[in-house]
Amino acid sequence: MGKKLNAAQKEAVCHETGPMLVLAGPGSGKTTVLLCRILRLLEKKLARPREILALTFSKAAADEMKERFLRAKGPEGVSFGTFHSVFFRILRSKYGWGVERVFQEEERRNVLRHIIEEAKWDIPDMEEYISQFFSQLSLMNSELESPKTFEPTGIPVEEFRKLYNAYERYKERHEKLDFDDMLTLCYQLLNEDAEVRAYWQGKYKFILVDEFQDVNKAQFECLRILAEKHRNLFVVGDDDQSIYAFRGARPDFLLHFPTLYPDAKKVTLNTNYRSTERVISLAEKVIENNETRFVKNMKGIGEEGDKVTFFLAEDTAKEAECIGEKIAKLLDEGVPLTEIAVIYRTNLQGGAFARELYKRGIPYDLRDNSGNVYEHWVAKDLLAYLLLAENEESDGGLRRILNKPKRYIGKDLLAEAETMPYNLMRSLFVCPSLKGWQEEHLENLRTDLNHVRKKSPYDGLKYVRKVIGYDEYLEEFAAYRRTSAQVLWEIADEIMETAKDCADVTMFRQRLEDLSQQIKEQTQKKGQKRKGVSLMTMHGAKGLEFRAVFLPSLVEGVVPHEKGLEEIEEERRLFYVAMTRAGEKLCLSAIKKRYEKETKPSRFLAEMGLDAEKFFT
């Protein structure tokens, strides 16, 4: 392929038969190794093109690998594909299924929406709820678990099971299957049909897997069966970059590979061609705190590079401002927009940097597309409170927040009020069936709304959350949904942050609309060539590289994230992935206050030898 291989790469490429585990650290040239190995198998006549299967996780990665292989004068006939595409091919060969059987994403969401509407469930966050159901369904299927024993998060168990049964009935009735079925049905078929199993085991003499640390149980079991006859399973991955536990991916299969295949050869690609020595050495200091891992002792190619920098800002807004300044300076120095990235822990953090770059006229790309916080139901609730305080005749606003927190105004009373000729608030007060204690709740709401009206949007929202009790409502809602209230509180915090310097409700509402519109425009750019500074989550940054990387808000509760503290090793891997995206420049930062609360420096800073405490005191 025109590239000189180092000793470890050569060892992996020249391996002939039997299982092999290639531990490939960041920037170590794993794709080159995979492609060179395929070319060598063909050159040495160990296999014909059609006897080789190369598997990866995304269609883009599979297409790129195939393109590079053909550019290197590789012959046609080698199978490059995703797990889903290959498993569907196996199912199609048995059942003759066409692609029209496969549920498209929007189609299956519509089906679930219809099921929920038929059941007359009151779901305040329908789209999020549907996403959560499918995310938990995928997790269950990837673990090959039964719905009878699976314990979902973010959705009550009984609701999950009812939806699951209705969804399965719909698929059966309409002869449909989704992406999860491709894994589970393929596993069943390979497990139960000896003829099919023998055919596919004979078909592929050599199987190569990229990003092996990301396999889930269903994928691994299918792989194990397919490779059983020839045992030429060549897997490439890095346990230190296993960051998709929420999808069922586990580093265990990689870590236990030598146990599952005692005759497996193991080689470590520990030369990072991407990052400078300084970046590599700091990243190593962090990741070596994980106990469950293979030691790799990553090294660079001798370029020490710029010092990794650190600064402490007062709060998120100041941090974003400082990063904005540094980005402007990099652009002046000739660093291209597309070679700069701000990588944060959660989607919520992106707003501050988007606002700052927008203000400076610096183009940016929001690379994660998972929801618009400014259109989240919590944002809509909070805005509804402010609008209702301004104008008691906002019937839509009152309907929205009437029982948030509980005021025990039931559907029957609401229906009765809606037959009256007045606005909804007044109608409720004059309903003949209104009980004294319900009237008291309404009086309290009216009094509270009067207080809110006299305050700035920021102080008004604080009153809604702390005095009226909206935060307690979020806590109850989270408990019912088997999820963390922290995430919902942080959304409310972010909306309050947006209100900070708004003089009135009109200005606040306009700001929410503008920010929401910016996110919609970014979403429409999906799939287009990137032209701006990349703003993305640590999960979204996997597999990418940049000359300059900023890692903001390195404080406890954010990095590592509050909800990831039980899985501290996964949080550390996530931070390691983020650090190793940097080629030349890495800038770390922390904040003294987040959403008005004092913070503590991230433990990862101490692990890399930075005494951040002295900055904080």
Residue ranges of each PLM-predicted region?
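Hydrophobic anchor at the beta1->P-loop junction of P-loop NTPases
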Residues: 22-24
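Helicase C-terminal subdomain and adjacent C-terminal extension
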Residues: 593-617
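Accessory C-terminal helicase-associated subdomains
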Residues: 431-540, 561, 612-616
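Helicase P-loop NTPase motor core
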Residues: 26-34, 263-265, 270-363, 389-391
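A basic/glycine-biased coupling hinge at the interface between accessory DNA-binding modules
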Residues: 17-18, 28, 39-190, 194-202, ...
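ATPase/helicase motor core of nucleic-acid motors
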Residues: 260-261, 304-307, 333-457
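Conserved RecA-like helicase ATPase core segment
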Residues: 2, 7, 36, 40, ...
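Conserved helicase core region in the C-terminal RecA-like lobe
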Residues: 79-87, 208-211, 236, 507-565, ...
